[in-house]
Curated annotation (Swiss-Prot):
Cofactor: Mg(2+); Mn(2+)
Reaction(s) catalysed (UniProt annotation): 2 D-alanine + ATP = D-alanyl-D-alanine + ADP + phosphate + H(+)
Signal peptide residue numbers: none
Example of a GO MF term: ATP binding
Gene: ddl
Family to which the UniProt record says this protein belongs: Belongs to the D-alanine--D-alanine ligase family.
Organism in which the protein naturally occurs: Microcystis aeruginosa (strain NIES-843 / IAM M-2473)
Descriptive protein name: D-alanine--D-alanine ligase
Lineage: Bacteria, Bacillati, Cyanobacteriota, Cyanophyceae, Oscillatoriophycideae
Pfam family, one: Dala_Dala_lig_C
Subcellular location: Cytoplasm
Residues annotated for Mg(2+) 2 binding in this entry: E311, N313
Annotated NCBIfam families: D_ala_D_alaTIGR, PRK01372.1, PRK01966.1-4
Length: 352
């Protein structure tokens, strides 16, 4: 039987480039398990920080070294020149995190190519990336969440007379403490916590430097709970896990510094709460029209028993130590079987 040709696509132009490389290395290892070797011929492709696609030879060098390709940022490049092997792929496994990878742009390209790919389509990816659109979808589905306010860069930078009024509105509608986030960045990039007016002004200015769309959320004292979802039209939820950390909040530095955070699987929470989280995770998956895989993050307010949805990540980190594969491992689905299942889900969705 001919092997299915899988294009493993990693790298990308976002700030999560190195995370993508690590995810791809783990996925390639999973494809090297005997059962997967018999079914799939995996060809890696690398997108550098300029957006250029590189062939399997370069991609393998990057995966071996674990280091991104050194490039000159000021040179003009032809981003439309794809390696010739691209047209031979039967299914793609994109593992690009952040903008230009999991925001619907790449998914649109693969859809135009009329080829199967792992993960959500254009709509699910867009909604899963933009926190404002995501929260609108969650609200429409009746999922409880913290108070939030959507604003734009122009409100922050354009008119110095309007900015103080904006800060007054945030203080009145959301209150302190609050979190200020760029709407379209992942891995907690650009997030700030504001406890007072001075910190709010600085946080808004910082977020505006990252994105033209900004979201302000009410702070809440809660445990951070996560659940993995797998499937297409009939998705299944994993066991529930918890993220614990030693900082004021779960920012980029805490997330990617060894020893600053840890995972607890399964989370030490009541069964009733765990079941509620799993049900809400599936509802969130459907609310954004996700496909294949997603990790859904929640706040569990222990003193009231409330479960509030935080966000959905339609292309979560995929290293051996990432929460998504670890949740499925604890549920009984090993890494190599998970990778196989995701490819099969992609092929099934393409057939429909």
């Amino acid at each position: 039987m001919d092997k299915i040709k899988v294009g493993l696509l990693f790298g990308g132009r976002s700030g999560e480039h190195e995370v993508s490389i690590n995810s791809a290395r783990s996925i390639l290892q999973a494809f090297n398990y005997p059962e997967n070797l018999d079914k799939y011929a995996v060809i890696p492709f690398y997108i550098d920080k300029n957006g250029c696609w590189h062939s399997a030879a370069t991609a393998r060098q990057i995966l071996t070294s674990g280091q991104p390709l050194a490039i000159e940022s000021n040179i003009k490049v032809n981003i439309w020149q794809f390696p010739p092997e691209v047209r031979e792929m039967e299914v793609w496994f994109p593992i690009l995190h952040g903008p230009n990878g999991e925001d619907g742009t790449l998914q649109g390209l693969l859809t135009l190519m009329r080829v199967a790919f792992v993960g959500s389509g254009v709509l699910g990816s867009c909604l899963g990336m933009d926190k404002i659109a995501m929260k609108t979808a969650f609200a429409a589905a009746g999922l409880p969440q913290v108070k939030y306010k959507a604003i734009t860069r122009s409100q922050v930078w354009s008119n110095p007379c309007v900015f103080p009024q904006l800060c007054d509105q945030i203080a009145e509608e959301i209150g302190y403490p609050c979190f200020i986030k760029p709407a379209n960045l992942g891995s907690s990039v650009g997030i700030s916590k504001a406890r007072n007016r001075q910190e709010l002004e600085a946080a808004l200015d910082s977020a505006a430097s990252y994105d033209r769309r900004i979201i302000v959320e009410a702070g809440v004292t809660a445990r951070e709970i996560e659940c993995a979802v797998l499937g297409n039209d009939n998705p299944q939820a994993s066991l529930v896990g918890e993220i614990t950390f030693d900082s004021d909040f779960y920012d980029y530095e805490t997330k990617y510094t060894d020893g600053r955070s840890s995972m607890v699987i399964p989370a030490n929470i009541p069964d009733k709460i765990a079941n509620q989280v799993r049900e809400m995770a599936v509802e969130a998956f459907k609310a954004v029209d996700a496909a294949g895989l997603s990790r859904v993050d929640f706040f569990y307010v222990e003193n009231t028993g409330e479960v509030l949805i935080n966000e959905i990540n339609t292309l979560p980190g995929f290293t051996n130590f990432s929460m998504y594969p670890q949740l499925w491992k604890a549920t009984g689905l090993e890494f190599d079987k998970l990778v196989d299942k995701l490819v099969q889900l992609a092929l099934e969705r393409q057939e429909k």
